[in-house]
Every structure is written in structure tokens, then in C-alpha cells.
């Protein structure tokens, strides 16, 4: 039964992380009562900073979650958590990391962690906006909220991991660039 649950759970939880930018602990701690499979909305409660927020699922992710839920309801009809092990308890971070490594290493030689899916979510959204000509300033607030950040400052972290993003942002935002990405003071520099 372990392999059956793993083969059902791994594709769903990793696609959920990839498509929503959820923190890994948010996915692991997701209670069934916080997943609305009719409306396609996940309520994130009691997470980092206790910042409750909502995530709207893409139609394809919603369909996958509905199918997964039907199968899991046959095995664990009264489960508390959305993703559970054979003992009907939520998976832990070690399970998630080990399974991510197995899958990732089978198709990639570079190093990555499950949490990198969150980083990828932010980077892909930022790149898509700039390529499609969206107003960056309007979109960053939405991204920040959907990722559960309390402030835009938390979301700005992702700029440092997107090559050449500062020049793209300067071209896109001109007069607001200094507000979005302030100059680093000498005492704040990292060596």
C-alpha cells in the first residue's frame, strides 16, 4: 500500500507545489476542510507568519486534485489531511524531500529541492509578465499575496535569483524602479 499511496500522491503534490508556489509545509499540512474542490480554492491557514491566504487552482490542477481525492476517499474516507501516508497521518518533510530527490535525480543532473518549485513559480510569473508587457508594479502585489507574503519586501527576494531582472525591471518601470528595488546601502552589502 505504501507504493500505491506514493504513486498516487507524488505527482499530485509536486504539481501542486509547481503550479501554485505553495510552501512545502503548506502542502504537507493541508487539511481536507481547507480544500474546496467545487470552487477550486485552497485556504492556507496557520502558515509562516500566520498569514491566511487563498490559492485559486488552475482548472487542470483542480481536476487532478478531484481525481486524487476520490481515490484517497476510498482508502481513507475520514482523513484529516489531504496528503496522508498509509497510517492516515500527514507526510513529513523528509518524505517529501526523499521523493522529490528520487524523481528529480532520475531526469536531471543538477541539484534541486522541492522548495525550489516555489522559487520557480515566482520566477516564471515574473518572466511571463515582462515578456507579455504587463505592468510589473500591478502584478507584483498579486504575486506577493498569492504566495502568502505579508509585504512586497518578502517577494523582492526572488529578484536576486532571476538573472538580468533588474535591467528588465528598470526598462519596464522607469520612475518606480528605485522604490521597487532600492539601492543597497554600504552597510547592507553582502560580501
Could you say what each language-model-derived stretch is?
Residues 1-191:
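Conserved catalytic core of the tyrosine transesterase superfamily
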